[in-house]
Amino acid sequence: MKRRLLVLTLLGLSAAAAQAAPITTVVSANGNGGNYGGSLSVLNDGIFPTEASQWNLADKVSWNGKGNRFVFAFGDLYRIDSVRLSVDNNDGYLLEYSTDYSAWASLLTVSSGVGEISWGMDTMATDPSDPEHVSQLAFTPREARYVRIQATDGDNSYSIGEVAFTGERADNGSTNPVPEPAGLALIALGLAGMGLARRRRV
């Protein structure tokens, strides 16, 4: 009985792990804002700048004036379950999503000063279980192939340190999902459970 309970528990944990996962993205610049400082590669490298750090250092993408947009391409249709991002604390930012790179709709609005940092870079998250969760970030999961971010208001000096998405490939995506490590673990545990049950019968 104990073995069966252990197997069922592990199966449940593996099933949860197989669902939501970080979404891999490719970043590009779009818009008419002109020059920006920093490398686009810092926006999706998984590294969040230190909070309250200076807005225009090399580990961020920074610029002056509105017009710049930075696009995150998922490579397939994904359901976005949560967003975690690092931006300059005293500016407003808009994230929009699209399935076709043509029609865009609002995904998330980040208002100036909603985080806990009073100066410099602030990390914020929509996931209530994240230590950086900000309750003022109204977020609804959406299916998208692209997300873009742009500045909307503030002191005209803007900065983004990281934008990370968590979710899973949508059922109607263009390709069949490749089994992830968590999914393979789920299969292995299922087979192990069947083996234990069979051994008890013999």
Report the location of each language-model feature.
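Extracellular carbohydrate recognition and processing domains
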Residues: L108-Q136
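Positively charged n-region of N-terminal signal peptides that target proteins for export
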Residues: M1-R4, E180, A197-V202
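Predominantly extracellular/luminal regions of secreted and cell-surface proteins
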Residues: P22-A52
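Sec/Tat signal peptide C-region and signal peptidase I cleavage site
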Residues: A16-A20
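A short, hydrophobic C-terminal helix/tail in secreted or cell-surface proteins
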Residues: P179-A197
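Bacterial N-terminal signal peptides
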Residues: L8-S14
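Sec-dependent signal peptide recognition
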Residues: K2-L8, G183-L186
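Aromatic, loop-rich ligand-recognition surfaces of beta-strand-rich domains
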Residues: A21, S53-V110, H133-P177
